Structure formats: C-alpha cells, structure tokens
Amino acid sequence: MAPEKRDPSKSNLSAVRENSVMVIGNFDGVHKGHRALLKAARLISGDTEKPISVMTFEPHPAKFFNPDIKPFRLTPLDIKTRILDDLGVEYLMLSTFDENLSEMTADVFMRKMLVNANPSHIVVGENFYFGKGKEGTAQMLQDHSDELPFDVSIFKSLSDDNNDVYSSTRIREYIQAGDIQKANNLLGWKWEIEGTVIEGDKRGRQLGFPTANMTLGEYIRPAFGVYAVRVAISSDDVTPAKWYPAVANIGIRPMYPSNEPLVEAYIFDFSADLYGKEMRVQLVKHLRDEAKLDTEQELIKQIRQDCENARSALEQTK
C-alpha cells in the first residue's frame, strides 16, 4: 500500500454502483466492525459476482450539525477512500450531507435516494439510523424491503474478547486517553496520521534530533505526549510503503510552546530532506506525557531515553 495522499475523485473506486451489494455507513476509522460488514456483503454477493459498494457521507454528519466541533476524524475522506479501495470495495457512493439531506424524511431516503442508487442488496449495522431526526432505523428499512427493489440485511454490533465494542466512538476515546494499543486493537490496523511535512523552527536539529513536522488537520487529537511510531514517506501508487522506525512528540511542546499542536517525528537513521512530502505516522505505543524540563541538557537526555524506549517498543510490536 503506497503512502500516497490522494484525491478521492482519483481513487480506483468508481461511482457506478448498479446492482451492487451496498454497505451504508460513515466508516470513520474503517474498523473491525466496518470490515465485518464488508465481509458479510462479500458473502452475500457470493458466486453472483455482484460488486461491493459503499454509501458514505461527507462532511461527517457530526460536522454538519456542529460546524465548530473539535477535530474528531479517525480517517479523513482521502484516507478512508484509500482503505476501502485496498479492502476491495469496487464502488463508492459519496453522498453530500447538506441541509437537503439532513431534512430528508426516512421515507424519502428509502424510496428515492436508496432506490436511485439501485443496489440489489443493502447491508447495515443494527445501529444504522437515517432520515430527519434519525427517524429511520435499520429495522424500519428491513421491514419495508418487500416494497423496495432490494433486500436488506442487518448485522449486530461486534466486540472483542473483552466485550469492547468495535465502534468509532470507543476508538476515539482510547486515542484521546493515549491508549493507542487498545484503539489499534479495535481498528484492526495501526492508526495513522497523514499530512504534508512543513518547515519548523529547526529546534530539533539544533538539539541533534532533526524532526519531520506536520499539523494534525482534521484528525482527532491524541493524548499529547511521546509515541513510538513508524513513518512512511510518499512514493507512488505502485511501490510498497517503506516504514521507518521513529519516535514522535505530538502536542504543543511545553518548553517551546506552539499555537497549534504538531506531530514532530525523529526518524532513526534517516537524513533526507522531507519538506513538502506527504508523511504517514503510524502510532504504535504511547511512551509518556509531554513534560516541561528545566534545561536543554535535560531535554536532550530525555530525548535519548525516549529513542531507546521507542526502539524497544517497536521491536516488540511488529
């Protein structure tokens, strides 16, 4: 999977979706619960060779209803699209969540929007809601399927061995708490932050630890602190991603405060100029919280320890 940040319109996913088995949802994080729905859709398709499609919404409904909401996305649209593409989804119906859609009744959503999409079968989770004020439920959709030109299958929410439900909300809670390993377990992949490398104040270089920096953009803010990470730099759509071990500070740097939280990654045994490149930072383990130290010498000593701890954590987590 090449570490390329791409325009969803240039994805391999097509907008054509007639006669497909369609899964509907926001798919933020494309976690294990979402993947189970996609697997169910593929089983329903079976030997019929009907394609798998996804209907999703942009902007996220939470952003539409609360424009000032703090950043909360696990996977911005371009990242979500790439993951769905990699998972074998063939068609994507990207529905603009605007005032018209927010005011649409459940009946109109079923009988016009879904009928116009022309799927042969629709797959949803049990907590799927639609229509103004969430008046439509998954059960309502299935109850009306005899009157509609498609079948409907509902699947219950799944959980891990500790009864932790696979949900975007739960994953966000873990990320904000710094429990990245639990978040990654529910995701089924190691959560990443992707963005363009920007020019910083070169403070890390002066200390002997040059960093590649980027802003957090739409991404939910993880617990500020130091993380063991792996980093991939943009290449192309053919060459597999090459991941480098690294340590990263995510936050506002208490000793040298910044107005905006940054991801600052020190890539081990790496020296190339990365300004303007697209970078993916895969979070593996939260090592410690941010801390304001008294002197630069103390900071250098702490960074060295962070590097050792990160290397150890990465060796234990493949």
Spell out what each predicted region is:
Residues 1-12:
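Short acidic-hydrophobic, aromatic-tinged amphipathic segments that line or gate anion-handling sites
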Residues 3-5, 92, 152, 281:
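Generic structural signal for residues in well-ordered beta-strands
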Residues 12-76:
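N-terminal catalytic cores of NTP/NDP-binding nucleotidyl/phosphoryl-transfer enzymes
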Residues 31, 84, 122, 183, ...:
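Residue-level signal for inorganic ion chemistry
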Residues 51, 66, 70-71, 78-87, ...:
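Active-site-adjacent structural elements in enzyme catalytic cores
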Residues 51-53, 91, 121, 153, ...:
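A structural signal for isolated positions on well-ordered beta-strands in alpha/beta enzyme cores
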Residues 103-210, 272, 292-298:
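Classical nucleotidyltransferase
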Residues 200-318:
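Phosphate/ribose-recognition catalytic cores of enzymes acting on nucleotide-derived substrates
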